[in-house]
Amino acid sequence: MKKYKIAVLKGDGIGPEIVEQALRVLDKIGEIYGVEFEYREGLIGGEAIDKTGDPLPEETLKICKESDAILLGAVGGPKWDNLPTDKRPEKGLLRIRKELDLYANLRPAKVWDALISSSPLKEEVVKGTDMIVIRELTSGIYYGEPRGIFEENGKRYAINTMKYTEDEIRRIVRKGFEIARKRRKKLTSVDKANVLEVSALWRQIVEEEKENYPDVELEHLYIDNCAMQLVRRPTSFDVIVTGNIFGDILSDEAGVVVGSLGMLPSASIGDRYALYEPVHGSAPDIAGKGIANPIATILSAAMMLKYSFNMDKAHDLIEKAIEETLNQGYRTPDIYSEGCIKVGTKEITDKILENLERLKDAYT
């Protein structure tokens, strides 16, 4: 029996309750596919600060480094907002990304037919949207030096530096091509090559890498045009790959196109490690009430199966079970609409588990 070690970082707010449901789904997947998942829990974020004074204790980092993948709930909350910046819960997550060199952020954006009215776009424009935005996460203008606010002759000025090395570009571009190859074989590279030298180099390297992926269709779009096309023709996108700042903007825009924050999973991937987490925050206002939507976390676990464990069929089975659950009318309060059946965190997972059992034969 194949065995995988998963670091489980439940975090703050609704984190523990939504992660608990994702683990129930993983256990069911293990049963269906004859795989064993071993969970090792670690502290992170506000909970870690309260217990150890550190948003990322060394013990947690050790657990992550000894695992095959990491599943995270959520970090942060108003309780810790007044702490010094370097001691806030979010610092724990940033440090994990840095320590494990998680350079590729994957943000799927899929419109579910049952939730199509949640999108701010017209149904005929958005129906069938299923894309993934891959954002370079560890370099670019957010990290470049020199940076800062300075004063000269009594006037202030500010500097930020956008810098990418060839290796940094090449590895994220390869990740884009590889993921496109596993999907619908179309890659959109987004840059500003008509103005920025960094983007000109980016485009050159994309063209060089294209030689290694002749089966993948490639298009180049400028960032401004891409931002427009995302709302004009979202269904035309499969995989988007881009730098840090452009990816920051486009991944949020793609999420709004979908319209349901509680349905958005994400992954941060490196060459050795990968971390999976929902896009939404810790929602402390509803923590412990049993009404949080666990679907984004369950979908994040499904991404883990696909991208860390190469269990593509298991990933597809989970997506199908969620789709069926939504089609049957079950909704947590955040995605509820009139005529549907309002259920809680555990109840919607119960329905997903029932559908996993019912649909499993088509995916094994």
Swiss-Prot record:
Binds 1 Mg(2+) or Mn(2+) ion per subunit. One of its GO terms (biological process) is L-leucine biosynthetic process. Belongs to the isocitrate and isopropylmalate dehydrogenases family. LeuB type 1 subfamily. PROSITE patterns: IDH_IMDH. The keyword Nucleus does not apply. Its main location: cytoplasm. Its cofactor is Mg(2+); Mn(2+). Pathway: Amino-acid biosynthesis; L-leucine biosynthesis; L-leucine from 3-methyl-2-oxobutanoate: step 3/4. Homodimer. It comes from Aquifex aeolicus (strain VF5). Mg(2+) binds at residues 224, 248, 252. Keywords: Amino-acid biosynthesis, Branched-chain amino acid biosynthesis, Cytoplasm, Leucine biosynthesis, Magnesium, Manganese, Metal-binding, NAD, Oxidoreductase. Its EC number is 1.1.1.85. Catalyzes the oxidation of 3-carboxy-2-hydroxy-4-methylpentanoate (3-isopropylmalate) to 3-carboxy-4-methyl-2-oxopentanoate. The product decarboxylates to 4-methyl-2 oxopentanoate. One of its GO terms (molecular function) is 3-isopropylmalate dehydrogenase activity. It is found in: Cytoplasm. This is 3-isopropylmalate dehydrogenase. PANTHER family: 3-ISOPROPYLMALATE DEHYDROGENASE. The keyword Transport does not apply. One of its GO terms (cellular component) is cytosol. The record marks 142, 192 as: Important for catalysis. NAD(+) binds at residues 77-90, 281-293. Substrate binds at residues 97, 107, 135, 224. The gene is leuB. InterPro entries: IsoCit/isopropylmalate_DH_CS, IsoPropMal-DH-like_dom, Isopropylmalate_DH. It catalyses: (2R,3S)-3-isopropylmalate + NAD(+) = 4-methyl-2-oxopentanoate + CO2 + NADH.
